[in-house]
Amino acid sequence: MKENRKIIHIDMDAFYASIEQRDNPKYKGKPLIVGGDPNRRGVVATCSYEARKYGIHSAMPSLTAYKLCPKAIFIRPRMEVYKKVSRQVMNILNEYSNLVEPLSLDEAFVDVSKSKRCKGSATLIALEIKERIFKEVGLTASAGVSFNKFLAKMASDFRKPDGITVITEENSKDFIRKLPIGKFFGVGRVTKNKLNNIGVFKGEDLLGFSEKELIGILGDRGKILYEFARGIDNRQVNPYRIRKSIGKEITLREDIEDIEEMIEILDKIAERVSESLCLLNKKGKTVTLKVKFNDFKHITRSITLEHFLKEKKEIMECVKDLISIVDFKNKKVRLLGITISSLEENIIIEEREQLSFDV
């Protein structure tokens, strides 16, 4: 007998920026950018919907964002606050199912297949969750409801912000057929271009290719796309998902104090970290810089983006932002390190369009 799964994907709307607008009424309705200082080689962690109208997006250099919208308000992230709010949201989700899989601070899958809440209706549960998040946390969330993780995630992005989309087995084929290939989960600029070159622009175009043909063009990720195009995704909601990190550090032969020299070394470290991410089929949201001084004391500085990254160029944009806020106190440095955490399995190994630095 076929399992009747009911999966909800909850995605908070412009999470960090929305928290700042909630806590600071003067920011409401204004283009707000959470991230680094545009005068210090910063990077955008996230931005409000008012800022997005100007073409600003996560992982964009702050200087570029400033040029697009000079009147934008730039503020530093308050990660401890965001983590606290995230726990509030996750606590609400856990009241509806013991199968909750957080993907990051601002999104999670919820398997309500066996839930008796709201008469067992996944749609009503999703609406109730959205209402509770708004009343209890003061933020909006978008929800996708479907019979597997791929479709639930695609659905949550369909009517942002503060929307809900339900994809049933009956309407799933039509939804997938019309879905632009660049919107498919994990399809980035490079994969999109490869598929466009063979005449694939929407989900329906994928149906004209066999699994073998897609694997020949895209490797293992061709199999994933073949299945996604047919509404197939058998991945389970995993509440025990282990958060791991990937990092590299170098102890220097001689202590240094020149920032440009540090940047050169960090660039090499970022390259090794990026290679490891690719080899392990991973992407991450949090970039952490570690600096150990010649008195053996060390500090770390982190930034968490809204979207996942793996490329060296993207990592270095964050690292340059982080090193700009380190107070060296005239001390020399003996060790440098970079760690990427909040990892997601990179099902299709390509950078996503919104993470491109080609601005």
UniProtKB/Swiss-Prot annotation:
Cofactor: binding details: Binds 2 magnesium ions per subunit.
Origin: domain of life: Bacteria
DNA-binding found in the keyword field: yes
Organism in which the protein naturally occurs: Clostridium perfringens (strain SM101 / Type A)
Keyword Nucleotidyltransferase: yes
Stored PROSITE patterns: UMUC
Binding locations of Mg(2+): D11, D106
InterPro entries: DNA/RNA_pol_sf (IPR043502), DNA_pol_Y-fam_lit_finger_sf (IPR036775), DNA_pol_Y-fam_little_finger (IPR017961), DNA_polymerase-Y (IPR050116), DNApol_IV (IPR022880), Rev_trsase/Diguanyl_cyclase (IPR043128), UmuC (IPR001126)
GO molecular function, one term: damaged DNA binding
Signal peptide start-end: none
Name of the featured protein: DNA polymerase IV
Leading EC class: transferase
Keywords (A to Z) from UniProt: Cytoplasm, DNA damage, DNA repair, DNA replication, DNA-binding, DNA-directed DNA polymerase, Magnesium, Metal-binding, Mutator protein, Nucleotidyltransferase, Transferase
Reactions catalysed, as given in the entry: DNA(n) + a 2'-deoxyribonucleoside 5'-triphosphate = DNA(n+1) + diphosphate
PANTHER family: DNA POLYMERASE KAPPA, DNA REPAIR POLYMERASE UMUC / TRANSFERASE FAMILY MEMBER
Any single GO CC term annotated in Swiss-Prot or TrEMBL for this entry: cytosol
Gene responsible for this protein: dinB
Cofactor(s) in the UniProt record: Mg(2+)
One Pfam family of this chain: IMS_C
Chain positions of site Substrate discrimination: Y16
Role according to the record: Poorly processive, error-prone DNA polymerase involved in untargeted mutagenesis. Copies undamaged DNA at stalled replication forks, which arise in vivo from mismatched or misaligned primer ends. These misaligned primers can be extended by PolIV. Exhibits no 3'-5' exonuclease (proofreading) activity. May be involved in translesional synthesis, in conjunction with the beta clamp from PolIII.
BP GO annotations: DNA-templated DNA replication; error-prone translesion synthesis; SOS response
Location in or out of the cell: Cytoplasm
Subunit structure as annotated in this protein's UniProt entry: Monomer.
